Amino acid sequence: MSKMGSSSMGELQDGITQEDSIEKKSKNVASHGEKRKVKRKKEDLSMDGSNDGVKDSPDSNDDSQSKKKKKKKLKKSQQPLNEENYPRLQTTENNLQKPLKISDLQELVFWCLADGQAPSWVLVRNKQMIHRAVILLVPGLEPSQFGFQPVRGNKHSFLLPNLLNENGPIQLPDFCEVFDRAWPTRSPGDRFRVFSPVNAFLQSPLSNEQKKKRDKETRAMASFSKPSDYLMSYESFIEDEYPLHPTVMKGEEVTQPSGWVASAGDFHSPPINPKILAIDCEMVRTENGLEIARVTIVDMKSEVIYDEFVKPESPVTDYVTQYSGITEEKLRNVTTVLSDVQSYLKKTVDNNTVLLGHSLNSDLNCLKFTHPHIIDTANIYNHTRGPPSKPSLKWLATKWLRREIQKAGALGHDSAEDALACVDLLKLKVKNGPAFGLFNQDFESIFHRLSRQQPTPLIGAIADYGNPESCIGKAAHKSVSCANDDEVVSAVVSLSDMHNFVWGRFRELEHAAMWNANRNTKQENNSDTDTENDSVEEDQVTSYSSALERFNRRIRLLYDSLPKGSLLLLYTGTGNPIEMSKLNAIRQQFRKEYQTKKWDELSVKWTDEENMKYISAVENTRNGLSFMTIK
């Protein structure tokens, strides 16, 4: 029997004609509100079947339907925006029973642009028409400015006020037109700390698939790990402000400053089987700043090969014994000077030598010695919060070596003990591989995650103060350095034309609100000082009010300049941190003095009462805000 006959008979045996099949599908789909799609599908199928009156095979029909769905979906995403397909956010006051987390904001971005899950707290209409997301960190705004104050355990405090109902600051009329609600948003942290709101947004959790891939690569790399794998890069030298060796300057002719010495040799290739020397120095304060008072060098056999006290060139003003372990008595008869140490280093350290240490940049700067092959344990191990925070050597020794160091208290540190700890930390790292001792390994840059999207990778950019490319913007397609908020606006608008995801940060409100200022914790009783303080506070209020007005204009300009189909999301990161910072300064001062002074000699006290106040201040600081809209 011919293929045509076979198909027709099979269709009759099933008791289903082509028209019956179409009608059945139409009814089924129409029940879900898609009558228009079914009508087009019916017409297309009728035309396809008019040539031979025979239904295609099931496989070919599925392929055809799949292709048509993809074409229609693509055509729909390319439609011009109108009232019917315009993307928008839909919510009610009762949607929120607790504050959002910054990770919730991140998931909203992934849902709109990539492979995220639908959020439960907001409905995104026509999300296929959203083509980019612009995120701004805007510290300096507080919940109380928008008519509410979130309180944990009280769900009514999270109801969302409408900004247009006289809840927003009078300086923000345009802002309140662009955004209709303020969303209470809680920063990550614990009882005593507020974690970085920058990392919270720009780092994304790894999927299980990515974790398996990472673990497989880690196991493979561990068996081939060697010390040279952990040499610092040129970029790390710059970022950590290491003194640069002439050969590191990429061919540029460099003259060593007076008094400085560089290691000699051919450094065009890394050492294959290097001699590794751990070095640690103790310093004292002199009339000309910090100077070397002791130098210790330990080899990889854990043997001390050099340990000398050094006579400072300038008069000592503070032996800082509680940190350095140096006393006047220890330096009294010392004749070794810095140039003697430099001569030893130049003789001992060559092109096959790697210098090892913890935050070795400070040691080398005091030694006035440069060398291009460096391993820094502060870089090859992570702080628990991840980069850019650096771990202390004491914490690394406790965590990974199960060893207590620097516990002499008032007697200070021991440079030999610190150098030995660095040796053991490197041995442990080489044994276990590059991923050992790193935190945030279950996270990746949001820019990496977006770039893996299929079928079209999404590209991200960043605009921030300073040099974002050296830190938070390393993984971004493009990073723009800005000097003020106006430059941030210009950069974000420009970047949004060619990028799917743009992150930026405003700083003016934060400065005007004194969020990042060091507050004086002491109260003065002088009446003239009180009058002066009142005047300063009035100036600060005026300055903040003016900053709000400029912020309002920038948001209007930014919103008007963005392309249609843009998700614009602002978050403050935290609430007001001033009280927390003030108490934390007292807390740190107490900890510092408690190590070396008697109780009645302490300049500050830290009791249970201060501790509870501090915990409460941290809690309040974690209460931030976010604002979102779609243009």
From Swiss-Prot:
InterPro entries to which the protein is assigned, alphabetical: Exonuclease_RNaseT/DNA_pol3, REX1-like_exo, REXO1/3/4-like, RNaseH-like_sf, RNaseH_sf
Intracellular or extracellular location(s): Nucleus
Region (Disordered): 1-92, 517-540
This enzyme's EC code(s): 3.1.-.-
CDD domains for this protein: REX1_like (cd06145)
Keywords in alphabetical order: Exonuclease, Hydrolase, Nuclease, Nucleus
Alphabetized GO MF terms: 3'-5'-RNA exonuclease activity; exonuclease activity; nucleic acid binding
Exonuclease domain sequence ranges: 277-426
Annotated Polar residues bias: 1-19, 517-526
Record bears the keyword Nuclease: yes
Bias-annotated ranges (Acidic residues): 527-540
Major site of localization recorded for this protein: nucleus
Keyword Nucleus carried by entry: yes
Alphabetical list of SMART domains matching this protein: EXOIII (SM00479)
BP-aspect Gene Ontology terms: exonucleolytic trimming to generate mature 3'-end of 5.8S rRNA from tricistronic rRNA transcript (SSU-rRNA, 5.8S rRNA, LSU-rRNA); rRNA 3'-end processing; tRNA 3'-end processing; U5 snRNA 3'-end processing
Basic residues composition-biased segments: 67-76
GO cellular component, as recorded: nucleus
PANTHER family with a match to the protein in the record: RIBONUCLEASE H70, RNA EXONUCLEASE REXO1 / RECO3 FAMILY MEMBER-RELATED
Family statement drawn from the similarity comment of this UniProt entry: Belongs to the REXO1/REXO3 family.
Name under which the protein is recorded: Uncharacterized exonuclease C637.09
